[in-house]
């Protein structure tokens, strides 16, 4: 039944489920909810679960958890950035078969059916706002030093109030749209966009709207050291590609928040060669809540067949583009057609 396109009344409906069966990755139990009005019927499936942090340890339904996660981009060798329900089903099935239990929607909210399928298949999800300043920052870069890079990165976007509306709005749209999905256990403010007053505002709104779910933002560590920032609404200390010694140092000297590897073991070439070392570290301390491998699939476009019948894939300048990432988009655990790389087999074994 199609609605007539107008909101007649807005409000909150409360109902109680006595002794609900709790949703988790091993038993992703869902309840069917049907909302009926004279002009519209909405059917949804929802789940119940709890999220808590105590002594820098994350608990789901009262049980300590480890994120065995992977970063996933929308990518299909035939349809590009548009991924179908069947393609996502293929991805999720392969992930389950290779012992993943979590996905980061790097670096943007996915189609609604992705989350519905994660609810059903039993994946914990980091839902990430579509905020990415890695590229725009290059417009402002002067002398290429760490100090100048981090200072300008903050000053020009993250710490410029002119960007507040754009940043907060994207976070709000994500949270409002996806708030009822049990698979989402964490909100991410975006990717590689530094830190400043705009992200403080986004975090504060998120925590006030949804105080239970975890908040994370790896770029919070990129800051202007001349300014004191507020990190009270940030639940995790997350890093990309830290050495094992850096993790040990954090746990020994600080450790006040759970440590998350939001990206690690970059899977280009032999990049996944240190899975076992990181897994030993992850399971060594309960404050290490796990990590998300970079990344799921190679990004390339199918471009016909070679004489031997094998598919030809184009990427990194193969279409004559001047600006491109060379082979840097070929860094997945699976080929574009989802055949496993050796790295995926190693991950399952570890």
Annotate each PLM feature.
Residues 68-73, 81, 128-175, 179, ...:
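Aromatic- and acidic-residue-enriched carbohydrate-binding clefts of CAZyme catalytic domains
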Residues 103-112, 192-197, 223-225, 245, ...:
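Acidic-and-aromatic substrate-binding clefts and catalytic sites of carbohydrate-active enzymes
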Residues 168, 183-187, 197, 207, ...:
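Substrate-binding clefts and catalytic carboxylate motifs of secreted carbohydrate-active enzymes
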Residues 108, 130, 190-194, 211, ...:
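Catalytic metal-binding/acid-base residues of hydrolase active sites
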Residues 68-70, 103-105, 125-127, 185, ...:
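Hydrophobic faces of well-ordered beta-strands that scaffold small-molecule active sites
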Residues 1-125, 170, 185-186, 202-208, ...:
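Secreted/periplasmic carbohydrate-active enzymes, especially glycoside hydrolases
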């Amino acid at each position: 039944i199609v609605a007539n396109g107008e909101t007649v009344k807005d409000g909150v409906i409360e109902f109680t489920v006595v002794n609900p069966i709790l949703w988790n990755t091993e038993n992703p139990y869902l309840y069917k909810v049907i909302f009926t009005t004279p002009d519209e019927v909405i059917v949804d499936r929802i789940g119940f679960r709890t999220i808590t942090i105590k002594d820098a340890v994350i608990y789901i339904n009262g049980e300590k958890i480890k994120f065995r996660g992977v970063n996933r981009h929308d990518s299909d060798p035939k349809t590009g950035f548009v991924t179908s329900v069947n393609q996502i089903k293929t991805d999720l099935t392969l992930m389950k078969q290779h012992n993943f239990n979590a996905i980061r929607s790097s670096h943007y909210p996915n189609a609604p059916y992705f989350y519905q399928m994660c609810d059903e298949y039993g994946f914990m999800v980091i839902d990430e706002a579509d905020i990415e300043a890695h590229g725009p920052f290059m417009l402002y870069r002067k002398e290429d030093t760490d100090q100048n890079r981090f200072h300008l990165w903050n000053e020009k976007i993250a710490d410029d109030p002119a960007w507040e509306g754009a940043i907060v709005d994207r976070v709000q749209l994500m949270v409002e749209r996806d708030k009822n999905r049990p698979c989402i256990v964490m909100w991410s403010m975006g990717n590689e966009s530094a830190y400043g007053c705009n992200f403080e505002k986004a975090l504060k709104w998120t925590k006030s709207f949804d105080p239970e779910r975890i908040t994370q933002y790896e770029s919070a560590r990129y800051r202007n050291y001349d300014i004191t920032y507020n990190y009270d609404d940030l639940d995790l200390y997350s890093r990309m590609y830290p050495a094992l010694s850096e993790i040990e140092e954090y746990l020994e000297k600080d450790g006040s928040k759970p440590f998350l590897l939001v990206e690690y073991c970059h899977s280009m070439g032999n990049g996944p060669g240190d899975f076992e070392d990181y897994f030993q570290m992850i399971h060594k301390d309960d404050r290490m809540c796990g990590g998300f491998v970079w990344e799921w699939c190679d990004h390339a476009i199918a471009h016909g067949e070679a004489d031997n019948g094998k598919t030809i894939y184009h990427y990194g300048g193969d279409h004559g583009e001047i600006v491109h990432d060379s082979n840097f988009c070929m860094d997945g655990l699976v080929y574009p057609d989802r055949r496993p790389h050796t790295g995926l087999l190693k991950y399952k074994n570890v």
